[in-house]
Amino acid sequence: MNNLLELSNEQLTSSLSKMILSASGWRTIFAKSGEEQDNTTEITDALAGISLLIGKSFCDWFSKEFSQIKNKRIVLACDTRPTGKTIADYVLRSVIASGFDIRYVGVASAPEIMAYARKLDGFIYISASHNPIGHNGIKFGLNDGGVIDGEKSKVLIESFKNLCNQDDASEIAKNLFSSCNQDLLNEVYQKTEFYKKECLQSYSEFFYEITAASKDDGIIKPIFSSIKKSIKENPISVACDLNGSARCLSIDSKIFAENEIPFFTINDEAFKIAHEIIPEPENLIYCADFMKKLHSEGNNSVKLGYMPDCDGDRGNIVYWSDDENQPKILKAQEVFSLSVLSELAFMDYLADKFPQFKSEKKAISVNDPTSMRIEEIAKCFNVEVHRAEVGEANVVNLARELRNQNYQVRILGEGSNGGTITNPAAVRDPINTIFALLKLLCLKDEVLPNGKIVLGLFHRWCKFSGNESLYRENFTLDDVTKTLPKYITTGVSEPRAILHIQNSNHSDLKSKYQKNFEKFWQEKKSYLFDQYGISSWQAVCNNGTKQTNSLTDFSVSARGGLKIIFYNEEKNPISFIWMRGSGTESAFRVMCDVKVLDNSEISLTKATEFEKELLEYHSNLIKLSDSI
């Protein structure tokens, strides 16, 4: 425990300058050494002071924003990063000193604390999501189940900066540390186990509501009975590489046991992070190898696997390919596509059985670099696709805006990272993704007592997408993936998806990019038409929840997402290129999405090559614009 006696204003402002502050979270390297791969629990005096001021900033903002709430009940938790509990102690002291009713649950996954916060007034969560182990950060939220929105976040960030830059900032931090009532602090720690149990119970109840799209036991029980019945007839087990994450101490094992689904785990001791945290293909290999091992031992029912990140809100999928007799790692865009397919089919299935689920206006909310395959899937269910800027908060807030316009928004998320958010949740959750796939595999055709035939989810999709000839009763996930719209899309963790630029003025950079792109178009348009049938383009930008089409001035996208959509002669979109500076990392992200024009191997090869070529053109134009 740091005593902060030597803490200075200069140390605070220096640490502040290294922080990334955005609606998605406030992040920096908290490890005392400053090394991002350091697994120490220690932090510097400056970061201890920053942690105290973070707690005060949130409490001051909350008190002003919600002055009508007298007994302000806040839940605090952390993931399993080594510095998490250290930071939590300083935040606790600050919140107690501010007079709030604070409930500390220790380690919890992000979806877990956000489910619990729905019964309270807000939350503070200590996590740096998928970033390396030496990083850590803070997320803030209210009782609506998600992080605070962009506008509120701006106010809070400004308040925090002002506090850190005050002449007496270091003295404020020291006073917060020393003025905390030790008896109250001890009492908070003593109640941790009790509140953790409450937290888990809230999360478990919320899981069933999310999966069945209802709080009504008359709907929940038949849905889960159908899943159990199907799994009994065609056994399915699930494997998970928990990688020492917060999900080691969450509801996963309980939920699978309650639904009679065998659950196999590795790296299931909290805090023992075995490998890199980000759940992208290079780290999903451990789950894939575990599934191979299980099959070699005779556990042939293991069909699905997943690996969460450290805070347990993001997790991508491995499935057992019966066609190839080996595990296959799904790409993030494929995971999101399957989740969207399943949940849209599920809502249509429910509407066939229960009239309250019928809706004339249906939509999904996605981020701007989500592959266009989502539009093709949604169109089959008469569902509109609306796009927001990258950032979970933006996608969640867009969904709220759509619901205020009387849209039914069942699913939302960011295809670029595979994260699935299923209403009424407002945060990604891998267990919801797994159960979306289980519903897709298990909810099959049934005959109602009145004789009406209700198509299962996959059969429904095959019919609506014009692929009914591909449906068979004993289908596998291989069969499902064969029916997905085919696209080649840059992976978010690929080295070529990240550029490092010098120009911090993104409006200026994009203005220069526009001139270079327009010149490129004049020089290459005949070639692009000959190579891939591209005949026109449209620029689109996404800032927060707002999308601007037919953009004539690229600079107005500022620090938001900028996308060029390419069209064929029939005015159908067939590819896009995209760019945006990261709000949480020092990186400039780029990607390309290309439609495979038909099911032939030639078309697949051509699309694969064209995606590489188009992304290289795009990246070179950005680099050229940065050098001017």
Regions found by a protein language model. Give the residues of each.
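Phosphate-binding and adjacent anionic-ligand microenvironments
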Residues: 304, 325-328, 346, 351-593, ...
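Short glycine-rich or small-residue beta-strand-to-loop segments that form or flank ligand, phosphate
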Residues: 72-79, 237-242, 591-593
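Gly/Ser/Thr-enriched, mixed-charge loops and adjacent short helices
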Residues: 7-19, 29, 134-297, 347, ...
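Short beta-strand segments
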Residues: 123-129, 241, 306-310, 412-413, ...
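Glycine-rich phosphate/diphosphate-binding loops that line cofactor/substrate pockets in enzymes
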Residues: 52-74, 217-234
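N-terminal small/polar loop signature for handling phosphorylated ligands or for N-terminal nucleophile
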Residues: 68-135, 252-319
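Cofactor-/ligand-binding subdomain signature composed of acidic, glycine-rich
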Residues: 1-49, 53
